[in-house]
């Protein structure tokens, strides 16, 4: 990834870094206010992340990081891939980018005032369209790859809930088949679906849920924890029945197993973060008989532990697969380790520096293990993780 920005453009962008550090969130708030004057544009965004401020904070941090690295945009390659995958999931298309450009530049002028000269705005316009064109090009490649496969689709597609499976006291799995009776594009184990819910009280609400079954052309399975409140998880748990229709876009995401497994694999999850791991384990059990796999999961207790019997069955089918569970509230009868997963335990019981780690779980879980694994000597390129919600600068680092 290389950019042909002039030295003058680079100087202008870098001159705004202190202002972005101070006023970045205000600029992004103003940008979204402008964008959301158009209801069709507003409907593209996850409003929950708008209301709690996480998206505003994350985007402000991303723009600041871009400004600081304007002379070395190659450091943003992984972010470009993650955002492109997310945009395909949210059905964002090339025609939406000019709206963002107008809103962003208008917000910069509104917040920075006279400091945002015509030269500064021109430089930021150039910087925006450089990134926007990278995203559009990558998104086009992703969509083409989906559409060339049997069962592929691009926009929102209607699925029928064909089965509900209680997995724990707070977690339920939902089997999904296309309403049109056609095939589905096989996902890569670890990817997710983006859903649009139009039930009463949450029009246009969007959520990402990892696919929790192995790749196939017939159906998907998602496994959802009942969260507090009245959002998508409450709708699925309390209102969605067998026969209920829900809409989603095709599987996307940059968190998945490689086509060729060259190193031992450690799957590490916390709570409902087990969902992409189950998908990976199903694929490994089916297609990678020689892969060496350690699955380590942490949860509160037996009542909160989802899919335990299914995971044990997968382990029994594969001669090189091991699974260990940690309960923070363990009883004497539980076949689990007591307490929390630790780096010392992983170092002693897995291949560690020789392994590829795949992580999914709550934000504190990920922040701790991404940082500590790398700090303990696992190469950063061997630490892969999935996080739902806007990625803050600390996580992205």
Swiss-Prot record:
Residue ranges of domain Globin in the record: 4-140
Annotated binding of NADP(+), by residue: 271-276
Cofactor: heme b; FAD
Keywords noted in UniProt: Detoxification, FAD, Flavoprotein, Heme, Iron, Metal-binding, NAD, NADP, Oxidoreductase, Oxygen transport, Transport
Annotated cofactor note: Binds 1 heme b (iron(II)-protoporphyrin IX) group per subunit. Binds 1 FAD per subunit.
Residues that, per the record, bind heme b: 87
UniProt catalytic activity: 2 nitric oxide + NADPH + 2 O2 = 2 nitrate + NADP(+) + H(+); 2 nitric oxide + NADH + 2 O2 = 2 nitrate + NAD(+) + H(+)
Site, as annotated: Involved in heme-bound ligand stabilization and O-O bond activation: 32
Active site per UniProt: 97, 139
GO molecular function, one term: FAD binding
NCBIfam families hit by this protein: PRK13289.1
HAMAP family: Hmp (MF_01252)
Protein name: Flavohemoprotein
Gene name tied to this protein: hmp
């Amino acid at each position: 990834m290389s950019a042909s920005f002039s030295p003058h453009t680079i100087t202008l962008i870098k001159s705004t870094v202190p202002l972005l550090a101070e006023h970045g969130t205000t600029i992004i708030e103003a940008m979204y206010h402008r964008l959301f004057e158009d209801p069709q544009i507003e409907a593209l965004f996850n409003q929950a992340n708008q209301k709690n401020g996480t998206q505003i904070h994350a985007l402000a941090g991303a723009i600041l990081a871009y400004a600081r690295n304007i002379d070395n945009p190659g450091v943003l390659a992984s972010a470009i891939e993650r955002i492109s995958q997310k945009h395909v999931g949210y059905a964002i298309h090339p025609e939406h980018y000019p709206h963002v450009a107008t809103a962003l530049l208008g917000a910069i002028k509104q917040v920075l005032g006279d400091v945002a000269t015509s030269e500064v705005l021109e430089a930021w316009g150039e910087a925006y369209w450089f990134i926007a064109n990278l995203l559009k090009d990558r998104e086009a490649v992703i969509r083409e790859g989906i559409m060339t496969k049997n069962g592929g689709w691009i926009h929102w597609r209607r699925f029928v809930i064909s089965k509900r499976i209680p997995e724990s006291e707070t977690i339920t799995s939902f089997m999904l088949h296309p309403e049109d009776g056609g095939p589905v594009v096989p996902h890569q184990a670890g990817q997710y679906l983006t859903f649009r819910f139009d039930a009463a009280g949450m029009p246009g609400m969007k959520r990402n849920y990892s696919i929790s079954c192995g790749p196939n052309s017939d159906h998907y399975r998602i496994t959802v924890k009942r969260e507090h409140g009245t959002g998508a998880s409450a709708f699925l748990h309390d209102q969605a029945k067998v026969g209920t229709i829900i809409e989603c876009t095709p599987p996307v995401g940059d968190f998945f197993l490689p086509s060729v497994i060259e190193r031992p694999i450690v799957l590490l999850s916390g709570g409902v973060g087990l969902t992409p791991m189950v998908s990976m384990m199903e694929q490994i059990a089916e297609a990678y008989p020689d892969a060496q796999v350690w699955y380590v999961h942490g949860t509160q207790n037996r009542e909160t532990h989802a899919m335990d019997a299914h995971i044990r069955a997968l382990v029994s089918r594969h001669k090189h697969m091991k699974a260990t569970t940690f309960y923070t509230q363990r009883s004497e009868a539980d076949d689990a380790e007591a307490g929390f997963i630790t780096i010392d335990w992983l170092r002693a019981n897995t291949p560690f520096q020789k392994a590829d780690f795949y992580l999914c779980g709550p934000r504190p879980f990920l922040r701790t293990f991404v940082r500590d694994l790398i700090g303990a000597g696992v190469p950063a390129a061997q630490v892969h993780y999935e996080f739902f919600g806007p990625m803050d600068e600390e996580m992205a680092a």
